[in-house]
């Protein structure tokens, strides 16, 4: 019966609204249910599986459909860690984290929940509690729409990062006067199916940060098109970059957070290759050489640990 409630379209995409209605109707009069995960049904009734995180996704879908007050996700860790345990020994567990903060950390490489498992409950403003099956006494991490009042004192929620990026640097005099220059540049990447991670710029310069792996197959063609179509004064590519994100909703209330981050990196004798910070001040992202990645993570974590 279960597969008839979790529904996929003919093209294999998940039909969230039809599924929400079907599960809601099926469970409306049931107090307790054991529901398998990972799969659902195509329009013709054949079984179709979720691509990743199937059991987590199923739990989230059911939580939304029944209007749950809380979605408990039991796993093998005691919650969201503030840093990568492969780099930081025994990083502390985050007690509360917002959906937005979690998305930033997950996108930058933190291994928590697959994004598809968060989306259904986020739409319904249902909190998630990540718990450890092997340590049920641990409170775990609560993923919430907004932080409780006491959590606003925390400046930094976590640090995450990822290696494997390249920077395509383009320079042209009077670039700022050419309407659509950056749009044209980004379209060249889009034509080859490459999305950009960040796009820091100056008056006459712009850098496109992309995945090195994604860039590799079309690298020469992209550089040729940039030269032919945009006529820049200079184009170069820097490989071997790592991106690091310092994430925290409380940073907006703390003066000097960015200055502190830059000072810590400088004191570690690491050169910052790129800086990006949104106006919402939810995160600060820097690029460093891959060879400096682990040292940068350790330096940042120990510097901000007491304000986490």
Question: At which residue positions do the language-model features occur?
Answer:
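Short hydrophobic alpha-helical runs that function as membrane-insertion/retention elements
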Residues: 70-74, 128-130, 197
């Amino acid at each position: 019966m279960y597969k008839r409630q979790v529904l996929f379209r003919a093209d294999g995409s998940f039909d969230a609204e039809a599924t929400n209605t079907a599960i809601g109707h099926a469970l409306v009069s049931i107090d307790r249910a054991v529901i398998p995960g990972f799969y659902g049904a195509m329009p013709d009734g054949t079984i179709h599986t979720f691509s990743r995180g199937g059991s987590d996704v199923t739990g989230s879908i059911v939580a939304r459909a029944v209007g749950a007050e809380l979605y408990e996700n039991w796993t093998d860790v005691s919650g969201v860690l503030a840093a990568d345990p492969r780099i930081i020994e025994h990083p502390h567990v985050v007690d509360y984290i917002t959906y937005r903060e979690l998305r930033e950390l997950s996108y930058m490489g933190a291994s928590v929940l697959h994004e598809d498992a968060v989306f259904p409950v986020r739409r319904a403003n249902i909190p998630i509690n990540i718990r450890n099956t092997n340590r049920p006494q641990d409170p775990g991490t609560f993923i919430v729409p907004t932080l409780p009042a006491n959590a606003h004192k925390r400046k930094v929620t976590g640090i995450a990062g990822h290696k494997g990026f390249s920077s395509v640097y383009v320079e042209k005099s009077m670039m700022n006067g050419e309407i659509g220059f950056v749009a044209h540049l980004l379209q060249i990447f889009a034509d080859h199916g490459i999305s950009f991670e960040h796009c820091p710029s100056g008056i006459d310069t712009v850098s496109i940060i992309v995945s090195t792996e994604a860039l590799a197959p079309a690298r020469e063609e992209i550089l040729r098109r940039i030269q032919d179509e945009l006529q820049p004064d200079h184009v170069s590519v820097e490989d071997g970059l790592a991106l690091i994100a310092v994430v925290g909703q409380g940073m907006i209330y703390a003066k000097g957070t960015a200055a502190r981050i830059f000072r810590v990196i400088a004191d570690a004798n690491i050169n910052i290759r790129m800086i990006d910070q949104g106006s919402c001040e939810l995160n600060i992202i820097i690029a460093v050489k891959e060879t400096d990645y682990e040292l940068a993570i350790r330096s940042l974590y120990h510097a901000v640990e007491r304000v986490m």
